[in-house]
């Protein structure tokens, strides 16, 4: 159990960058501190698999939301009283090793922040508290890919809006005022409609493969899309419309002074997206995961490497 005494001593919030759930978690924690009259700790957004994460310097009393200390160096944080709240399967050993709280299919980073930061600290009107609870729930529905949830459409809308507005906007909004949930959902619905229109063209142009793995036939779709912020939704649309068992989408980014290829994986459960991502040093959940590979790989090389790895992992 995370105590209020431990929370009020936090020196820095570290949250998952470029992720609606990570943005949501940071907003929730920041709002919780503001509600007590405290100056909220500064927030540092970091992405898994980047130099900033791998080379992170350990400090006393850091609060990790939807992310952990580096998986290969986490023991350096022992004795520094970190609070670690994460739900990524590949980081479970870090969370448990540092006596943090590991989530499940109903507790993403935002829900963990709500239950373990806002609930112990909160001092706000019930209506505002309930709005943050709803916000956390929608972040969780989207991040854990609960497509059958009646809240799926709103969860997608919220994710689009958070990515467009940006992580710094999110933290500042939590500092200066009430949660603008209705405005975010209204913006997100418009964005979602635009993304769905884009998705129809991607379905037509996606590369399709039928993989024979043991006694199974696995249907695979692969596509490239320049906008990393919308690739998850388009992958989900492709999976439903083709239909197929697993979708692999990739795009290129410039980070750590180099070009890298970011690969996003979506699965219907027939193939574990997490197992595939972890084999490349990434992570995620069984139906939604991701990883990074060298940015100088050609599209044909990416297709060959990924399809070969899927076959190897599922023989």
What are these regions (language model features)?
Residues 149-208:
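Accessory alpha-helical/coil subdomains and C-terminal extensions
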């Amino acid at each position: 159990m995370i105590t209020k005494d431990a929370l009020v001593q936090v020196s820095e919030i570290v949250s998952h960058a470029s992720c609606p759930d990570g943005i949501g978690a940071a907003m929730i924690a920041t709002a919780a501190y503001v509600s007590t009259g405290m100056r909220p700790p500064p927030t540092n957004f970091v992405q898994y698999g980047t130099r900033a994460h791998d080379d992170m310097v350990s400090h006393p009393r850091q609060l990790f939301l939807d992310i952990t200390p580096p998986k290969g160096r986490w023991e350096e944080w022992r004795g520094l009283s970190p609070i670690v709240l994460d739900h990524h399967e590949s980081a479970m050993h870090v969370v448990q090793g540092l006596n943090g709280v590991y989530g499940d299919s109903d507790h993403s980073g935002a829900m963990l922040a709500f239950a373990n930061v806002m609930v112990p600290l909160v001092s706000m009107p019930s209506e505002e508290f309930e709005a943050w609870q709803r916000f956390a729930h929608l972040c969780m529905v989207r991040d854990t890919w609960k497509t059958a949830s009646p809240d799926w459409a709103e969860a997608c809308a919220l994710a689009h809006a958070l990515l467009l507005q940006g992580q710094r906007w999110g933290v500042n909004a939590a500092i200066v005022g009430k949660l603008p949930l209705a405005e975010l959902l209204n913006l997100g619905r418009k964005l979602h409609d635009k993304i769905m229109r884009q998705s129809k063209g991607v379905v037509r142009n996606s590369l399709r493969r039928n993989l024979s793995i043991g006694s199974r036939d696995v249907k695979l779709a692969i596509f490239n899309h320049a906008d990393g912020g919308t690739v998850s939704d388009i992958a989900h649309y492709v999976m439903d419309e083709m239909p197929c068992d697993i979708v692999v989408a990739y795009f290129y980014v410039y980070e750590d002074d180099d070009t890298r290829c970011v690969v996003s994986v979506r699965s219907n459960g027939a193939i574990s997206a997490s197992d595939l991502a972890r084999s490349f040093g990434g992570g995620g959940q069984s139906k939604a995961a991701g990883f990074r590979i060298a940015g100088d790989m050609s599209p044909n090389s990416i297709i060959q490497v990924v399809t070969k790895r899927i076959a190897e992992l599922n023989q």
